[in-house]
């Protein structure tokens, strides 16, 4: 299973960096077995306001994640997610929000998480975290 962080969804719609936009969009639509996390959906819709000057708004963001949700599973947080996030926050020294996404990945069999912000060469607890914008 594969998942993307909020920034990947955001860059797919952000025309200010055409290379990142192309990379993110291609990645999203080429990933097999994708999972959308509720937190990522909410953050993406909220962040779409930053793209209003470019003709992209919350309504379009909502439409796009609904469309993506037709081919990807959607996962909602539960207490196990929060428990895992609290443990990861103290053990890995990462923010609670990042830990929540990682916890969701670990609980739902995600093997690869694509994120610009969480990039780590070592991964976390077997989860591979990949920055798709980094040159190999």
Predicted regions located by residue number:
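Short, well-structured N-terminal submotif of metal-dependent ribonuclease cores
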Residues: 1-36, 51-63, 136
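Active-site neighborhoods of divalent-metal-dependent phosphate/nucleic-acid chemistry enzymes
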Residues: 72-114
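Alpha-helix C-capping/helix-to-loop hinge sites
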Residues: 12, 30-31, 47-51, 68-72, ...
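Aromatic- and histidine-enriched alpha-helix N-cap/loop-to-helix transition segments
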Residues: 36-39, 96
